[in-house]
């Protein structure tokens, strides 16, 4: 049968495989493409095609990530798979590959391992909304009681990190059996069950355009006779001419009205997520606005100076620091379009942070930034990126 062209009419969702090294993340990714290819929803990608992941740069950090796409009857998916543990850490913290949900792969033969725990913690910290579990390699386990034990362990681990461990779907199967065309009861049918669970359990993300308006300010001009224009790329939502907005961050929040929107020198009646626009703001002086602030729907985002973050610190080879740092370290935190100096407090029991570590830390900025949970930032010293992080929770 002729392969049907990917239809872009279905809702889109970004997912990825996470879990301990060698538990079968890449094999499962290959098995999903193989299974869905039979119904025209994917092009089969073999293990070695996925494993040879290209390097990409995100926020000054090099990350290897493989991207595959496929679709089920319900949704179109972009799926990320990383070759190494460090790539997962970097990917999740930088948000280079946004995940609306993830498939946690656990080997039934080994049970949860250190990186299983670490990936669940990272998923919690960076705000991955939902997980589905694939208990892989069940063909290597003869004892059904052992399988039940592993499932129980996984559920307890998920609950320990505030995921609903009792409710998360756990599918038991084998990626390898699927790839080798073995017993479909362990292989192909279980992969179909997994995708049904992903369809049903991972919520459809809200489209950026449906969220409250926010635009990071990149530049400010004054146009004689017209007033002040701020430019930037709309991150989310829609702004219409005549809308009241707030200018948030770095100084006291100001209310104003958008009196004009232009794009490529043409006047528009609105700007929406993804557009690079200039917004004319009423009664605002050129010196009252600066790069690093945001335009936002009133009340939708507030300025803060203190937060808890999850961060990855670059190795020397990645262009990062050569030496460790300690509590009271004062780098710059680059949010959206600007740097703000902040002080780092390490958690109790953590004496120092070595290049290559990922850590939880408390940060206090010297000036407030418009932020919400999940906001990404770079850690810089004199314009050079030495780390990346994500706001896990706001404390003040």
Swiss-Prot record:
Residues 174-176 are annotated as: G5. It catalyses: GTP + H2O = GDP + phosphate + H(+). InterPro entries: EF-Tu_GTP-bd, EF-Tu_GTPase, EFTu-like_2, EFTU_2, G_TR_CS, P-loop_NTPase, Small_GTP-bd, T_Tr_GTP-bd_dom. It comes from the Bacteria. One of its GO terms (molecular function) is GTPase activity. The keyword ATP-binding does not apply. Residues 10-206 form the tr-type G domain. Its main location: cytoplasm. Residues 81-84 are annotated as: G3. Mg(2+) binds at residue 26. It is found in: Cytoplasm. GO terms for cellular component: cytosol. Pfam families: GTP_EFTU, GTP_EFTU_D2, GTP_EFTU_D3. Its EC number is 3.6.5.3. Keywords: Cytoplasm, Elongation factor, GTP-binding, Hydrolase, Magnesium, Metal-binding, Nucleotide-binding, Protein biosynthesis. Residues 60-64 are annotated as: G2. HAMAP family: EF_Tu_B. Monomer. Belongs to the TRAFAC class translation factor GTPase superfamily. Classic translation factor GTPase family. EF-Tu/EF-1A subfamily. This is Elongation factor Tu. It comes from Gluconacetobacter diazotrophicus (strain ATCC 49037 / DSM 5601 / CCUG 37298 / CIP 103539 / LMG 7603 / PAl5).
